Swiss-Prot record:
Organism the protein comes from: Drosophila mojavensis (Fruit fly)
Keyword Protein biosynthesis: yes
Comp. bias (Basic and acidic residues): 1-11
Similarity field: Belongs to the eIF-3 subunit B family.
Summary of subunit composition and partner proteins: Component of the eukaryotic translation initiation factor 3 (eIF-3) complex. The eIF-3 complex interacts with pix. Interacts with mxt.
UniProt main location, coarse: cytoplasm
Described purpose of this protein according to its UniProt entry: RNA-binding component of the eukaryotic translation initiation factor 3 (eIF-3) complex, which is involved in protein synthesis of a specialized repertoire of mRNAs and, together with other initiation factors, stimulates binding of mRNA and methionyl-tRNAi to the 40S ribosome. The eIF-3 complex specifically targets and initiates translation of a subset of mRNAs involved in cell proliferation.
Cellular component, GO annotation: eukaryotic 43S preinitiation complex; eukaryotic 48S preinitiation complex; eukaryotic translation initiation factor 3 complex
Listed name of the protein: Eukaryotic translation initiation factor 3 subunit B
Leader peptide range in chain numbering: none
Subcellular location: Cytoplasm
GO biological process: follicle cell of egg chamber development; formation of cytoplasmic translation initiation complex; regulation of translational initiation
Spans annotated as Disordered: 1-33
């Protein structure tokens, strides 16, 4: 082609000496190319379609039991039941030796490749029993491992990321607590501010726009704060609240931390119900997942106090999983016919559960020691409609609120059951005493609320009519029945909030927004009765020194914000914040001091008073100085603005005189001003008199 084009051009203009002939790229005769297609087009050839060999839907299951022919059918039944949960099984082959004994592995073909991948994901490392743990792989993995390059290339060294101190918030020399405030700036867009509760004014630490889509939540020890997003959740921590870890679980609606902050549980919707995933917080790895049957599964897991066990309730059973493997304890569930609820002790590996009445068998509350699964106490109950389990924070007592009935009315089909003549019992288990004695308190009125004193031996009950209820305080002592120590009558409260340190309690009406602060060691005197209209939440700080009440925009759309009070009910500050949604104090980890050291400090507390008083005086002096400096700065700013406007007013004098008929009105005396009164008709009314 190049030669032909050159000839045509020469014929057209033979005298054109500037024309250069195009180069000829043809290979010489007999030339053989020595480069292969793989070397030349390797990346393209790797993407070309290949003929399927039909093994994409086949999995290989290793580490299976080696059984005799007589036991093969039973093994097949167990394996098919387990793997059929992942999809339709087309064919299964169990290779056998010369004696007919299985070789410990099997080939399993599913209907689709996606079902095979799901089987690998769900059942790889599945523990069949204490001797056998499955190793499930795709058959196509053999081809992948055959093509491993012979020359080993070391992995690229990743740069070390220095993580900030996650516990810096407890190193403050004055022990100021922190809190976060969330406000919705747009739909699915929440601004979160982090503050330190310093005196006289709080100190802003950090403010993040669009920090979360819905709300935030602190971990139990205050190390992390979790945020919610469409792809999943993330946890943040450190001095500047850096991202520590993220957990991909689309549509997560709720999360739970384990008590020691080793694990995180996320709850998110699926087309068939709820999916629950348990994550390792430090590595971000998924430890185990479950599928629930609806919204009722929120908070379905219960953790032991030391993170060694996590439990959930099944049909007539409790499933207890060991960490970190998350296998069932002893590889089987605990069968309990008629179980209706359970709860862990906050300080010991003891589970309390209750079962309903069945076939003339009374209801029962049982305490079980884990991992021995040994029942350490039983209590039979009669005519039971419902039970609620309330552990005291220190684990010293368990209260079982029993809803009892006098008569039971059923329809003909026994589908609709009505309980008549309701009354209530409080069964108090003394956990620290020998053989765990049980005391009972009976109340014949409607129970509105119950709350234990976190550190102490008292509990409080709201009972009676909602608008005119009574609040009773009981004291529990060793060897005697719980005694009524005080009853406050005709109160309109609906909720009880004890101080984390005990002694003080807030009786709140979260419908009307009224609060009463009570000191339970000073003859139960009401020290203050503030109100916060439409308040929907009450939050004690971890030290029991401050209380916050909040009006959230989730409840109302106007006058949202929060108030802060002392433990005696004295108002400290009021904050009005548009679209305020949440206020949360940052939790504190338990003290590292022994009980003996704490007692010693309390005993010698008087010698620390002068130090604290001196700090208070310095703080007040510093606060006064800062206040004076702030006022001086405001005055200086105002005077600067005033002088600027006066200068502008003087520059406009000639313009004013011209507009006012060449009369200088700036220097007019009041005596020279004529006052003229003008009257005009505004309205006329006619009234007919009979």
């Amino acid at each position: 082609m190049a030669k032909k084009k050159s000839e045509e051009h020469s014929g057209a203009d033979a005298n054109d000496s500037d024309y250069n002939e195009e180069p000829n790229f043809d290979d010489p005769p007999g030339y053989v190319d020595n480069i292969s297609d793989e070397d030349l087009l390797g990346d393209m050839l790797a993407q070309r379609p290949s003929e399927a060999d039909g093994v994409e839907s086949v999995v290989v299951v290793d580490n299976m039991p080696k059984v005799e022919p007589s036991r093969l059918e039973k093994l097949k039944s167990v394996i098919n039941k387990l793997f059929s949960q992942c999809g339709e099984i087309v064919n299964v082959v169990y290779p056998v030796d010369e004696e007919g004994k299985t070789k410990g592995y099997a080939f399993m073909e599913f209907k689709t490749a996606s079902q095979a991948e799901d089987a690998v994901k769900k059942l790889n490392n599945h523990r069949l029993d204490k001797n056998y743990t499955f190793a499930v792989n795709l058959f196509t993995d053999f081809q992948k491992y055959e093509n491993i390059p012979e020359k080993w290339e070391p992995p690229t060294v990743q740069p070390f990321k220095v993580q900030s101190d996650l516990y810096n918030f407890i190193n403050d020399p004055d022990a100021y607590d922190q809190y976060c405030v969330a406000a919705e700036t747009a739909p699915n867009c929440v601004q979160v501010g982090f503050w330190q509760n310093t005196l006289p004014e709080p100190n802003e630490l950090e403010t993040r726009e669009r920090f979360t889509d819905t709300f935030v939540k602190w971990s139990p020890l205050g190390t992390y704060v979790v945020t919610f997003h469409k792809p999943g959740v993330a946890i943040w921590g450190g001095s500047s609240f850096q991202k520590i870890q993220k957990f991909p679980h689309p549509g997560t609606q709720f999360v739970e931390f384990s008590p020691c902050e080793n694990y995180l549980v996320t709850y998110g919707p699926t087309p068939t119900g709820q999916k629950i995933i348990i994550w390792d917080i430090r590595t971000g790895a998924e430890k185990r997942s479950f599928v629930g049957d609806g919204m009722s599964v929120l908070s379905m897991f219960r953790w032991s106090h030391d993170d060694k066990f996590v439990a959930r309730m099944g049909e007539n059973s409790i499933h207890i999983y060991e960490t970190p493997s998350f296998y069932l304890l002893d590889l089987k569930s605990i069968k309990i016919a008629g179980i209706r609820g359970f709860s862990w002790s906050p300080t010991d590996n003891v589970i309390a559960y209750w079962v309903e009445e069945q076939n003339q068998i009374p209801a029962r509350v049982t305490l079980m020691e884990i991992p021995k699964k040994r029942e350490i106490r039983n209590k039979n109950l009669f005519h039971v409609a419902d039970c609620k389990l309330h552990w005291q924070k220190s684990g010293d007592y368990l209260c079982v609120k029993v809803d009892r009935y006098s008569k039971l009315k059923k329809d003909k089909k026994e589908l609709d059951v009505k309980f008549l003549g309701m009354f209530y019992n409080f069964e108090i288990f003394h956990m620290r005493e020998k053989e765990i004695p049980v005391d009972s308190v009976e109340i014949r009125e409607l129970i509105l609320a119950f709350a234990w004193e976190p550190i102490g031996n008292k509990f409080s009950i709201i009972h009676g009519e909602p608008n005119s209820a009574n609040v009773s305080f009981y004291e529990v002592n060793k060897g005697v029945k719980p005694s009524l120590v005080k009853r406050l009558e005709k109160k309109s409260c609906t909720h009880l909030f004890w101080s984390p340190r005990g002694q003080f309690i807030v009786m709140a009406n979260l419908t009307m927004g009224t609060f009463e602060f009570v000191d339970t060691t000073n003859d139960y005197i009401i020290s203050a009765s503030p109100d916060h209209f439409r308040a929907s939440e009450v939050e004690w700080d971890p030290t029991g020194r401050y209380v916050v009440t909040g009006v959230s925009s989730w409840k109302v759309k106007e006058d949202t914000g929060f108030n802060m009070y002392t433990f005696q009910g004295r108002i400290i500050r009021r904050t009005i914040l548009k679209n305020f949604v949440q206020f949360l104090w940052r939790p504190r980890p338990p003290t590292l001091l022994s009980e003996e050291k704490q007692k010693e400090i309390k005993k010698n507390l008087k010698k620390y008073y002068p130090i604290f008083e001196q700090k208070d005086r310095l703080r007040l002096t510093r606060a006064s100085k800062e206040l004076l400096e702030k006022r001086a700065q405001l005055r200086e700013t105002f005077m600067e603005y005033r002088n600027k406007r006066i200068a502008e007013w003087k520059d406009q004098k000639s313009r004013r005189i011209m507009l006012r008929g060449h009369v200088d009105t700036d220097n007019l005396e009041t005596d020279e001003v004529d006052e003229e009164v003008v009257e005009f008709l505004v309205k006329e009314e006619v009234t007919l008199l009979e």
